[in-house]
Amino acid sequence: MTEQVRIEPVIDYLTGLQDRICQGIAGADGSGEFKEDSWTREEGGGGRSRVLTEGAVFEQAGINFSHVTGASLPPSATAHRPELAGRRFQATGVSLVIHPRNPYVPTSHANVRFFIAEKEGAEPIWWFGGGFDLTPYYGEDEDCVHWHRVAKAACEPFGPEVYPRYKQWCDEYFFLRHRNEPRGVGGLFFDDLNEWGFEKSFAFMRSVGDHYLDAYLPIVARRKDTPYGERERDFQLYRRGRYVEFNLVYDRGTLFGLQSGGRTESILMSLPPLVRWRYNWQPEPGTPEARLYEHFLKPREWVE
């Protein structure tokens, strides 16, 4: 018997997830509030973007839900999958990036998504994707271990091989080839997930989405009151430049969104509000800034 593939329960889950994460982030901030911007897309679908700016803890937090439909796919989607050409599609997901004010609090990103392409007389082509990853400026081993423990816990019900596979994929995906360095300390990344069938794949996507706040909020609570000065802030803004470079050059979601006529404001919501580039800057040996490169920006096993 063929398993039924339905987008409606996925949309229900994702809108609820956006609500829960907004509540968790606003609660951790203590003073900031999310402003909602609902939008529709001429070709079909729409979404709701929620942004918290100038909070006590978070300089900017963007949490976006979208459900877009179209009669055909953009080149970024069909280049490696010619079987998708000529199919109508639906894509839905929640994507978020949290940029904290304090340089001792890492930036975090999470995304869970579902894609389906259909045409008359043919089986639908569908998959799930997503993950979450952490980008510290002044890293702490304790935080990285906690982040990866929660990532592993999200995967464990689905088999012992799942966390190592998606942890490695995350390390490989969030890598700036032109800098030859990782974006951060990783986490989970998965895409094109359909081999488990619809229900199990959907359950895994939910597990990843449901574990994000457990992974991030304890780190925020530990670091948000750490004293810092101009030097730390300057380094944070410099390292944010790497975030911008990755999102505009490599990120699949950004490229897909821009090529498919997505909503530019929502797609670029992931970019930090302030950022700084410096020509050929290098950290002084033996400094906390150098330790980020030497100790944290090297893929490693954080949990057994």
Swiss-Prot record:
Q: Is Cell membrane one of the keywords UniProt gives this record?
A: no
The keyword Metal-binding appears for this protein: yes
Membrane spanning stretches: none
One GO cellular component this record assigns the protein to is: cytoplasm
Q: Which InterPro entries match?
A: Coprogen_oxidase_aer, Coprogen_oxidase_aer_sf, Coprogen_oxidase_CS
Record-annotated active site:
109 (proton donor)
Region Important for dimerization: list its residue ranges.
Answer: 243-278
Cofactors, names only: a divalent metal cation
UniProt cross-references to PROSITE patterns, sorted A to Z = COPROGEN_OXIDASE
Query: Where does this protein hold substrate?
Result: 95, 111-113, 261-263
Q: Which reaction does it catalyse?
A: coproporphyrinogen III + O2 + 2 H(+) = protoporphyrinogen IX + 2 CO2 + 2 H2O
Task: Kindly list the biological process annotations in GO that this record carries.
Answer: protoporphyrinogen IX biosynthetic process
Keyword annotations of the record:
Cytoplasm, Heme biosynthesis, Metal-binding, Oxidoreductase, Porphyrin biosynthesis
EC annotation?
1.3.3.3
Which GO MF terms are attached to this record? Answer: coproporphyrinogen oxidase activity; metal ion binding; protein homodimerization activity
What is the uppermost EC class here?
oxidoreductase
For this protein, the record's Gene3D superfamilies field holds: Coproporphyrinogen III oxidase, aerobic
- Oligomer and partners: Homodimer.
Q: Which NCBIfam families match?
A: PRK05330.1 (NF003727)
Tell me what this protein is called. Answer: Oxygen-dependent coproporphyrinogen-III oxidase
Provenance organism: Thioalkalivibrio sulfidiphilus (strain HL-EbGR7)
Protein encoded by which gene: hemF
